[in-house]
């Protein structure tokens, strides 16, 4: 049995509720995989990071993977900010569409049109603890548990797992979600927001859209089946 949580996107209160549902179902310290995107859009990215760091430091059975938003955050905090080449031209991490502005706000850094980009960057580097940067930058990209393969975005169909690139593992979308190939294991991922976590035969999408205000719904995998965890208990996630 293993639990999983999709994209959190700064929703600390939702994360607390999801963890409470997991504890109610599985006890004090069951294995939990987080598939990335802890920052951006929601109101408390800092709080989410601190909660994850505290859990890992306390020895909880948590596997915390890295997502594309987590990488964008750490890249922005380099000596010279790096923009991810997967972004569309003219769209920066600080744009509200991506939500970097709310991440910096959780550290007390205001992103406004009246401020110079260099001043925002300098204040951000001073405000964000190096421990937070290191924690996100050092997260693994994948986790294998039996016939479950956990990853942030997905995999490149037809490419052996050891040859998958970091960019695909945290950024791939249409080439993965539109492919019905049997990958030889169930790919459990986030990244592509849906209305709720959904089983699609060859993959299980955990991203129920918490970054857009929808609930953060944890999932439990046990004996080849999957269930959503709700206040009423387990709800079977049938393949669609």
Predicted regions and their residues:
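Active-site neighborhood of divalent metal-dependent phosphoester bond hydrolases
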Residues: 28, 45-138, 176
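Short, glycine/charged-enriched secondary-structure capping and boundary segments
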Residues: 17-20, 47-50, 78-81, 164-165, ...
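Active-site environment of divalent metal-dependent phosphoester hydrolases
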Residues: 9-13, 40-43, 69-74, 157-158, ...
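Acidic, His/Gly-enriched loop-helix segments that form or flank divalent-metal centers
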Residues: 98, 104-205, 209-215, 221-236
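A general structural motif
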Residues: 27-30, 59-61, 146, 184
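Well-ordered alpha/beta subsegment
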Residues: 238-240
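N-terminal active-site segment of His-dependent metallophosphoesterases
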Residues: 1-51
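Residue-level marker for buried hydrophobic side chains located in beta-strands
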Residues: 4, 32-34, 64-65, 149, ...
């Amino acid at each position: 049995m293993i639990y999983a949580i999709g994209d959190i996107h700064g929703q600390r209160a939702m994360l607390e509720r999801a963890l409470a549902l997991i504890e109610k179902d599985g006890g004090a310290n069951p294995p939990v995989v987080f598939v990335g995107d802890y920052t951006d859009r929601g109101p408390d990215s800092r709080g989410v990071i601190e909660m994850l760091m505290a859990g890992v430091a306390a020895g909880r059975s948590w596997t915390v993977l890295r997502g594309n938003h987590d990488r964008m955050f750490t890249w922005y905090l380099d000596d010279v900010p790096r923009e991810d080449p997967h972004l569309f031209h003219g769209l920066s991490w600080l744009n509200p569409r991506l939500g970097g502005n709310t991440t910096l706000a959780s550290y007390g850094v205001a992103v406004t049109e009246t401020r110079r980009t260099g001043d925002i960057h300098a204040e951000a580097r001073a405000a964000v603890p190096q421990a937070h940067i290191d924690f996100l930058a050092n997260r693994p990209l994948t986790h294998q548990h039996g016939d479950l393969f956990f990853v942030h975005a997905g995999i490149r169909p037809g490419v052996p797992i050891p040859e998958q690139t970091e960019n695909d593992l945290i950024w791939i979308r249409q080439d993965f979600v539109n492919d019905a190939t049997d990958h030889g294991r169930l790919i459990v991922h986030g990244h592509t927001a849906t209305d709720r976590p959904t089983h699609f035969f060859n993959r299980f999408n955990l991203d129920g859209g918490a970054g857009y205000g929808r609930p953060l719904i944890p999932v439990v995998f046990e004996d080849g089946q999957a269930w959503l965890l709700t206040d009423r208990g387990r709800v079977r996630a049938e393949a669609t």
